[in-house]
From Swiss-Prot:
Its cofactor is Zn(2+). Belongs to the queuine tRNA-ribosyltransferase family. QTRT2 subfamily. The keyword Metal-binding applies. Non-catalytic subunit of the queuine tRNA-ribosyltransferase (TGT) that catalyzes the base-exchange of a guanine (G) residue with queuine (Q) at position 34 (anticodon wobble position) in tRNAs with GU(N) anticodons (tRNA-Asp, -Asn, -His and -Tyr), resulting in the hypermodified nucleoside queuosine (7-(((4,5-cis-dihydroxy-2-cyclopenten-1-yl)amino)methyl)-7-deazaguanosine). The keyword Glycosyltransferase does not apply. It comes from the Eukaryota. It comes from Drosophila virilis (Fruit fly). Binds 1 zinc ion per subunit. This is Queuine tRNA-ribosyltransferase accessory subunit 2. InterPro entries: QTRTD1 (IPR028592), Queuine_tRNA-ribosyltrfase (IPR050852), TGT-like_sf (IPR036511), tRNA_ribo_trans-like (IPR002616).
Amino acid sequence: MKFVLKSISKNSGRLGQLRIKQSKELQTPLLLQTTKGGSIPYLSAEVFDLVSQEHQQVLQLTLSTMDQMSESLAQWNRSLSDYVGYPGYNTLLLLRDPCETTPTGGNDRDVVPLFTRHGKESLTAARYMDMVANFAPDVYQGLCDADTNPESTKKRVQKSVDRTERFMELCYEQHSKLARLKDSTLLAPIVGGYSTFARTQSIKHARQQPAGSYGGYILEGFHTNGLAATELKAAQLLPIVEHCVQQLEEEQPRLMPGAYTPLLLLELIRLGVDVFDSSYAYCAATNYKALTFSYVRDKAEHAAFLDVTDEAIKEDFKPLLEDCSCLSCQKHTRAYIHHLYKTHELLGTILLMIHNLHHYMCFFEAIRASMAADQLPELIEHVRMQNTTAEVNYRIEPNNKVVGKAAMGKGFIAAAV
């Protein structure tokens, strides 16, 4: 993997180009496509191709949702992207699913807990590297203890750093020995919770490795994934990230997985983080929210979301978002998608996922354009206020509404009698 900086600005972050193997150059800041079990959630490969036209794509795969495929992949002699049905796509393998809350605990001295749909599996560093070798992704993260959050104690934070160092010693060794990983790039994990001292220790351990041992950094241990990432406070997170990036080489890309809010994501980009994922769009769709925030500076007021469970839109025949060119907005209305929610139709979530992914990919195009014009601060302020009088709240609230049978109507069969 090769990363080249195109420009860097104190106010607008850094633009770069990332090339994975022999792929086309990928522009950074880059949006990774979050997957579950190797598939884009709710979308077939054919539908996703329609959604992602003219957008660059890298698949973010997770071991916690694909662990059962390890044995069959060991016998696979083609690329991982071919195996999951997305031939030609670059692949990046993570340990944990950023879309779902990762349970805490289960951290023994020499193992990391892997929470899968089959239960908890204890991974040693040797077992982890064997599984990664079976997958043979283009890029993968080193094994780390990232079980920390804003409430973690100093003792838990220090343990996460010490254990990660032990895991990574074997990961660095095996990365150079395993034949199936000779074309793969290792990302060095930077952990340490919200302690600048612990983060510095983690960074020093990575930078002590011989040149070429790894090809980038992944900053972990800020949250427990899922909706927890949307609740992070900028005042807590940003100083720690800034402390980290100041100690990292400029020529190495930096990845931060998680469903960060659009506003916090922009602030992280300003600090110098290069790669993110689409888990925020997924979390919004699964909680019946269509992304409607504006990333084009205008004078109209905008909201962060449209809640399709709201009874107020049951007779609203406008698209989810005016002037949106996605398939959902071109073909369907708010009232119809509200009806799909009330009748528990899977198509409702599919249409929301199509819209949210399209909106988020276009958001990243706007980010790169603003950075090229050195206008990222103006975009941050626009996203922050959305032309309203108060800062917009981008936190995703879990949908706990229950649709009763009475609200679903009599149904077609009963109505025909």
